[in-house]
């Protein structure tokens, strides 16, 4: 039985109709005996990975926000220090105009007759609400806000800086020339974010190839948690970047020891839910991987990124050609797959295996005699990337996690949904 002041406070606020956000560690699922029960919300209400709690038989809800996010529905990103493009998606906390004036709260009664205010029905979608942060709800040239000048309300652009042009997700793509079972042989310059993770043998000298990985910044590699079920200490791991051939050294490859191995604390080794891990590369300076044509970080997605169903994406890795193959591929391979609708990414289509909201499905929809070679991930590809083109940059959508066989017709592969873990990634990458 749990009977804490925090729990009682949450219950009282829910019943009183309060809607607010709580830090993750402040919320408890169990209530004292006799209080009203509450559970997950019936519909998506919280952004950026926030968890929604709703009192039974009541419409009121509480958003439990990940670190770095706040607001009624976790819509404010407290870490955003610049805006991209025109700043339509900027959700930071900058509140000063170019003239140095303080912005007016979007919920102010003084703005009631203005077109854009925090009381619109679509205010949350536009980034407006009970705050005075700069926004661009009308697709203007940059973020702006209302300020008071000479007793008048005027629109002024804000002094929030523009983000530097990102180089993540850029590459020199080479059209694959050789076909292989399950995919196409490719060059590392086509997938410069691909990492190869090796582990020391426990009972003999040398090391063995363990899993794929994804470079997401100079010193961090994202991969799958299930790769580390044997609990290797970080000093027994090695990460290689810039390698076309799995065991043959490349001219421009970069090799790193591992400083830290962080496995998601709620990883389920039965269902593979929360199948995500981070490796911190070891370096004597703040810079680890050096950017080149063969080594480059992938772009992480925006939290609200939703690509259309059946969007064509790519996977890469050094895994087996098919499930019956005795060895991993000697050369890096790529596969072309399409994002499945969520309605087709369920246990029903995957032999009753558990599929959670932290997973997404992608597969090769071609079939028949013309396309006998179905592209798919296989053993050894785990931890590698599922990337899609977004805003002219390749962007990470998934981490290769599990599947039923390899290259089976009409059976998609299952990937860890990266957008659900942006807060977790950010928190664990902090010094």
UniProtKB/Swiss-Prot annotation:
Peptidase S1 domain: from which residue to which, for each copy? 180-430
What are the EC numbers?
3.4.21.68
Catalyzes what?
A: Specific cleavage of Arg-|-Val bond in plasminogen to form plasmin
Q: How does it assemble?
A: Monomer.
Q: Listed disulfide bonds for this chain?
A: 41-52, 46-63, 65-74, 82-163, 103-145, 134-158, 168-299, 211-227, 219-288, 313-388, 345-361, 378-406
- Single GO MF descriptor: serine-type endopeptidase activity
**Protein's recorded name:** Salivary plasminogen activator beta
What is this protein's function?
A: Probably essential to support the feeding habits of this exclusively haematophagous animal. Probable potent thrombolytic agent.
Which catalytic residues are annotated?
226, 275, 382
Q: Which UniProt keywords apply?
A: Disulfide bond, EGF-like domain, Glycoprotein, Hydrolase, Kringle, Plasminogen activation, Protease, Secreted, Serine protease, Signal
Task: List the subcellular locations.
Answer: Secreted
Domain EGF-like: start-end pairs? 37-75
GO cellular component terms, A-Z? extracellular space
Glycosylation, residue list: 139, 352
Q: Report domain Kringle positions.
A: 82-163
> Per its UniProt record, what PROSITE patterns does this chain match?
EGF_1, EGF_2, EGF_3, KRINGLE_1, KRINGLE_2, TRYPSIN_DOM, TRYPSIN_HIS, TRYPSIN_SER
Q: Which family does it belong to?
A: Belongs to the peptidase S1 family.
Q: Which GO terms describe its biological process?
A: plasminogen activation; platelet-derived growth factor receptor signaling pathway; smooth muscle cell migration
Q: What positions belong to coiled-coil segments?
A: none
Q: Give the signal sequence positions.
A: 1-36
Record InterPro entries: EGF-like_dom, Kringle, Kringle-like, Kringle_CS, Kringle_sf, Peptidase_S1_PA, Peptidase_S1_PA_chymotrypsin, Peptidase_S1A
